A protein has these predicted regions:
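Residue-level signature of catalytic and energy-coupling elements of molecular machines
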Residues: 19, 39, 123, 199, ...
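Alpha-helical membrane-protein architecture signal
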Residues: 12, 16, 184, 266-270, ...
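Juxtamembrane transmembrane-helix boundary signature
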Residues: 58-79, 110
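Membrane-embedded alpha-helical modules
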Residues: 93-210, 346-456
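Loop-to-helix transition at the N-terminal end of transmembrane alpha-helices
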Residues: 44-63
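Helix-loop-helix junctions within the multi-pass membrane cores of secondary transporters/permeases
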Residues: 2-36, 57, 78-87, 91-139, ...
Length: 456
């Protein structure tokens, strides 16, 4: 049955590999179950309701990805978009969280239309292969940087923006132990991968978590909520209280539009739409490139199904009570473990569904245990750099700017925007437009990106 649905042999994989890959993807994404409620509750939403909505929206989106596209990509409410939802739309602009959900819902409807009319697919195919390879590398650096941050290996600095963690004095017990455990986790995971241990990334997460538990039991690791270092020992395993979901479910349809200008509403909606569109395209490009899923023309077969899954999940998430649901770059961790079909994503989706019940257990997975997986995934995605034509400055410079922008701007969509603008203008100004056969859609995207920077 699984073979018939997911075509495992055709994709050179098996059930065990797909299950391990799906579990790995979930483990690297599980942090969203804790982070999303924390961020959205700042807007006045009930945290428990958001937790359940996050789990269900992730299940819906990821299961649809498995069934509609047969790809190993997982979806969940996107980081960055949730912060924009709470801190900008609600707290700064003064709109209700119900109206913010309506903006997300409308964005999802527009995406469904764009996916049905192949507009999103056309944008994907219009991006030149050099930039697609650069996006994959840029996402790798971005994911690794997120891992370093999650592990507290990189911290804020007033003088240099960021700096490495210091391992001396009281800092060791307050924050440093988690950072040290993350470094140990990177080494453990690397050894497992060098030894070609199947499921090495997943085992690396679990071993690092166990080491954290031992450190907490012996007093070496001291939980400190103010520093973002929580207990790694589960105090309970299950919860059957689902009543909180009623506080957010369907609230999107009770939006009060009085006093809200139509232009202001569409400005908010467009911001969600822009970031979601290019974050999703960037993730699909990057992870698909890593998995060798792109054909010789740089196109992704069955992309329409993947984009429909993403679009429907956004609408479903808004109805359930969460911000924009999007494809996660952490999907690359499952791909690195060998995941190649929808069985990987279905496994991840089922785990998100189970998280509704087992949330107390999943919420104790520490960030220092999943950080090594993200760092190692970053390494694996560097391979796409070999496909970039660095000997041609017209190709290499835009690719470099794309790679540079993603971790430094902390945004996949910004990296794509800078790459598209620089590639189009550089080839146009130097008279290479005819030679490179620049798509009309690339000109349109370039103009839209420039207008975005000028007007927004």
């Amino acid at each position: 049955m699984l073979e018939k649905i997911f075509h495992l042999k055709e994709n050179h994989t098996d059930v065990k590999t797909e299950l391990m890959a799906g579990i790995t993807t979930f483990m690297t994404m599980a942090y969203i179950l804790a982070v999303n409620p924390s961020i959205l509750s700042a807007s006045g939403m009930d945290a428990n309701a958001v937790l359940i909505a996050t789990s269900l929206a992730s299940f819906v989106g990821t299961a649809l990805m498995a069934l509609l596209a047969n790809y190993p990509f997982a979806l969940a409410p996107g980081m960055g978009l949730n912060a924009y939802f709470s801190y900008t739309v609600v707290l700064t602009m003064g709109y209700s969280w119900q109206l913010a959900l309506m903006a997300v819902f409308v964005e999802g409807i527009i995406f469904i239309v764009l996916s049905l009319t192949s507009v999103r697919e056309a944008i994907f195919n219009a991006i030149p292969m050099t930039l697609k390879s650069a996006v994959s590398v840029g996402i790798g650096l971005f994911v690794a940087f997120v891992g370093l941050q999650n592990a507290k290996l990189i911290v804020n600095s007033d003088s240099t923006l960021v700096t490495y963690q210091h391992f001396k004095g009281e800092t060791v017990h307050r924050i440093g132990v988690g950072a040290i455990l993350a470094l140990v986790g990177v080494l453990i995971t690397a050894v497992l991968l060098v030894k070609k241990v199947k499921g090495g990334i997943l085992y690396g997460i679990l071993i690092t978590w166990v080491l954290g538990i031992l450190c907490e039991l012996t007093g070496i690791y001291i939980p400190n909520a103010d520093a973002g270092m929580y207990s790694v020992i589960p105090t309970s395993f299950i919860s059957f209280d689902f009543s909180a979901l009623g506080k957010t479910f369907g609230q999107v349809f009770k939006t009060d539009f009085s006093g809200v200008g139509i232009l202001n509403f569409f400005a908010v909606m467009f911001s969600f739409l822009f970031v979601d569109l290019f974050d999703t395209l960037g993730t699909l490009i990057g992870v698909a490139s890593k998995a060798d899923m792109l054909d010789e023309d740089g196109k992704l077969p069955h992309i329409k199904g993947a984009l429909m899954a993403d679009s429907i999940a956004t609408c479903a998430g808004a109805v359930l009570g969460t911000s924009t649901t999007t494809t996660f770059v952490e999907s690359a961790s499952g791909v690195t473990e060998g995941g190649r079909t929808g069985l990987t994503s279905m496994t991840t989706g089922v785990l998100f569904l189970l998280a509704v019940v087992f949330s107390p257990l999943f919420l104790t997975i520490p960030s220092f245990a999943t950080a090594p997986a993200l760092i190692i995934v970053g390494f694996y995605m560097m391979g796409s750099a070999l496909k970039i034509e660095f000997d041609d400055p017209a190709e290499g410079i835009p690719a470099f700017l794309t790679i540079l922008a993603m971790p430094t701007a902390y945004s996949i969509s910004e990296g794509i925007a800078i790459g598209v603008i620089s590639w189009t203008l550089l080839n146009l100004i130097t008279g290479k437009a005819k030679e490179k056969k620049i798509s009309p859609l690339m000109y349109i995207l370039t103009v839209l990106f420039i207008l975005k920077y000028v007007l927004l």
